């Protein structure tokens, strides 16, 4: 497998519960390396822009409200097969369906407060990384 980069987000429901370190440790223990990280408080405009792909979905308003309710940690992760590896360690979107030992099984409160987001493909990883980081902020 090739070394690749992916985007990872620790959502407000997790940062409010002081889980940033625990979640980052799970990612690093899975073999991923943090090459960029910053804590942001998303504006409504940023949340709507980042999640624009979901704008016509019934949960969009609730998603934007949740993402603007507290600080978020946005990160770029690097490693062999980073996109798939991150998806695996995050677990299923619905924590009730997530595998034991995954971030969502361990830390998520509900499907709406599922603690993390991660890119699902190389194209979305590139877009999501570019949304939050300049090239000079990524130090690998």
UniProtKB/Swiss-Prot annotation:
GO terms for cellular component: cytoplasm. Its EC number is 2.7.4.6. Disulfide bonds: none annotated. Its cofactor is Mg(2+). The active site is at residue 117. It is found in: Cytoplasm. SUPFAM superfamilies: Nucleoside diphosphate kinase, NDK. GO terms for biological process: CTP biosynthetic process; GTP biosynthetic process; UTP biosynthetic process. It comes from the Bacteria. It catalyses: a 2'-deoxyribonucleoside 5'-diphosphate + ATP = a 2'-deoxyribonucleoside 5'-triphosphate + ADP; a ribonucleoside 5'-diphosphate + ATP = a ribonucleoside 5'-triphosphate + ADP. ATP binds at residues 11, 59, 87, 93, 104, 114. Keywords: ATP-binding, Cytoplasm, Kinase, Magnesium, Metal-binding, Nucleotide metabolism, Nucleotide-binding, Phosphoprotein, Transferase. InterPro entries: NDK-like_dom (IPR034907), NDK-like_dom_sf (IPR036850), Nucleoside_diP_kinase (IPR001564), Nucleoside_diP_kinase_AS (IPR023005). One of its GO terms (molecular function) is metal ion binding. Major role in the synthesis of nucleoside triphosphates other than ATP. The ATP gamma phosphate is transferred to the NDP beta phosphate via a ping-pong mechanism, using a phosphorylated active-site intermediate. Belongs to the NDK family. Homotetramer. This is Nucleoside diphosphate kinase. It comes from Rhizobium etli (strain ATCC 51251 / DSM 11541 / JCM 21823 / NBRC 15573 / CFN 42). The lineage of its organism: Bacteria, Pseudomonadati, Pseudomonadota, Alphaproteobacteria, Hyphomicrobiales. The gene is ndk.
């Amino acid at each position: 497998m090739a070394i690749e980069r992916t985007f990872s987000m620790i959502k407000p429901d997790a940062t409010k519960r002081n889980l940033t370190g625990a979640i980052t440790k799970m990612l690093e223990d899975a073999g991923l390396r943090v090459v960029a990280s910053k804590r942001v408080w998303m504006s409504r405009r940023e949340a709507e822009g980042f999640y624009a792909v979901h704008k016509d979905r019934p949960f969009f308003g609730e998603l934007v409200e949740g993402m603007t309710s507290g600080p978020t940690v946005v990160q770029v992760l690097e490693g062999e097969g980073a996109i798939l590896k991150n998806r695996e360690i995050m677990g299923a979107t619905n924590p009730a369906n997530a595998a034991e030992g995954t971030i969502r099984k361990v830390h998520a409160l509900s499907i709406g407060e599922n603690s993390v987001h991660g890119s699902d493909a190389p194209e979305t990883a590139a877009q999501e990384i570019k949304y939050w980081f300049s090239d000079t902020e990524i130090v690998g």
